[in-house]
Amino acid sequence: MGVTIRNRNYDHGSLPFLQSLLAILLVTTTTLHINGVEAFHEIHYNLQSVGAENVKQVHRTGYHFQPKQNWINDPNGPMYYKGVYHLFYQYNPKGAVWGNIVWAHSVSTDLINWTPLEPAIFPSKPFDKYGCRSGSATILPGNKPVILYTGIVEGPPKNVQVQNYAIPANLSDPYLRKWIKPDNNPLVVANNGENATAFRDPTTAWLDKSGHWKMLVGSKRNRRGIAYLYRSKDFIKWTKAKHPIHSQANTGMWECPDFFPVSLKGLNGLDTSVTGESVKHVLKVSLDLTRYEYYTVGTYLTDKDRYIPDNTSVDGWAGLRYDYGNFYASKTFFDPSKNRRILWGWANESDSTAHDVAKGWAGIQLIPRTLWLDPSGKQLMQWPIEELETLRGSKVKFSRKQDLSKGILVEVKGITAAQADVEVTFSFKSLAKREPFDPKWLEYDAEKICSLKGSTVQGGVGPFGLLTLASEKLEEYTPVFFRVFKAQNTHKVLMCSDATRSSLKEGLYRPSFAGFVDVDLATDKKISLRSLIDNSVVESFGAKGKTCISSRVYPTLAVYENAHLYVFNNGSETITVENLDAWSMKKPLRMN
């Protein structure tokens, strides 16, 4: 492997480059960009059925899930059935903007290579005449899959929502090519106490010890986010519980709720129906107000059908997230073949609608992740599925430890830096040079601090990390880095994925995504980082998956063979690269 050392002082005046069964909300409004993800799906009636003459390949991902062309959004109803993984997803078969939505359907035996099938669900009945929105899959006894999804029974402006089900036409077909929507739909309608225009996203159902099936539906009342609970003995006749399983003031519409158990010990996942003293439960909601996903770990009181979050994290906007970047509308499922819980999440584009139409596609599914509970019991851990490693190609590694003093860049050569997987561990000798954490920053979120203290702002312990998708002269780059602050009687570790200098292209949304990492550096003085780099997306996992950040970026110079990868340090404390392994990533043999 070749190594290039550049002595760079990241000062703002020093270099030229430093000067530059999940429902979808149907709202016809001007697009609001909140934290980089559209707050409402932008409705372009004149573009919904405009197909691309030529699908442009620049910025298309090499190993992420996406169809050949057109728009995709929420992952729907993921499941494992008779040796086959299924992923349904919201898809516009006619264009690269939101509209004409159907449940597209792809199958795989390894979660890497995907074969597209005909759409499984599309508007065709009175109970979904105006739309088939997101939902979940449940495996009933006897290995019988059923899909719960939201149907739209009145068009704009009301968009009245009901909950429907669909069943396979042929259970002997492992690909489940054809689905039937029985005429006894809808199963659940909003009553007088519920908001029928904000009533969607049925979860995977679970079976309690009394023999009742239970599911959640997301909603809101004024600004209070709500997860309503429904019970059924036969999966057909559903009764609303007297109270929601959980709600929270000032959180707005709870989209895409997900509710599942996690084991207190070990990495194994659990079937959704598991309860008992050896498990905690996770409630995840996607907040329409912020377009981020939040979760809590807590206790499910089965006798009262109440969920009580632990007091180890905030229950609301300032709470834990699966991902602190471009990640939304997620859905998990239990994979019995490997006893794991797998998370799917959608990343939309940060480019303009005009560019989406011109290139002929929009949206990707991020790499599936395995979820488990951290030994502390306070948060989840996430890691890319092990199957991803089958795509690793040529490998480079540092043959020895590499010390990085302030301003040093070390280039990682010998791989395709535009399409790579890199794992690195950083260490340092002392925390003495930590910068003080300004008390007024407590009023800010992590993104604000990252925008103030970016990779070019010299610090004490950090910033240090990776420069991904970098051009040769560093006119473009996307840094993923850590910065350690001294807080009262402790330290705070900030992790950033900063798209500010990711592209010279005008009109892009270039956020400074960030989150804090709950890790004790006082004793070990080490922290790890893994980044999956794929042309227009960088997925990063800090501290073995404690904090995750995904960014969509669109370099103009750092594309294909012109992309570079570096490790860097811009803090006064010398940082040591303990080890670094990087791989070129191959394309799957089949991607839709």
Curated annotation (Swiss-Prot):
Enzyme class: hydrolase
Lineage of source species: Eukaryota, Viridiplantae, Streptophyta, Embryophyta, Tracheophyta
Record gene name: INV1
Entries under SMART domains matching the protein: Glyco_32
Keywords associated with the record: Cell wall, Glycoprotein, Glycosidase, Hydrolase, Secreted, Signal, Zymogen
Intracellular or extracellular location(s): Secreted, Cell wall
Name of protein: Beta-fructofuranosidase, insoluble isoenzyme 1
Regulation: induction: By wounding and bacterial infection.
InterPro entries tied to this protein: ConA-like_dom_sf, Fructan_Metab_Enzymes, Glyco_hydro_32, Glyco_hydro_32_AS, Glyco_hydro_32_C, Glyco_hydro_32_N, Glyco_hydro_beta-prop_sf
SUPFAM superfamilies (alphabetical): Arabinanase/levansucrase/invertase, Concanavalin A-like lectins/glucanases
Expression tissues: In leaves and roots of young plants.
Signal sequence range: 1-39
Propeptide: 40-48
EC number(s) given by UniProt: 3.2.1.26
Gene Ontology biological process: carbohydrate metabolic process
Its job: May play an important role in phloem unloading and in stress response.
GO CC terms of this entry: extracellular region
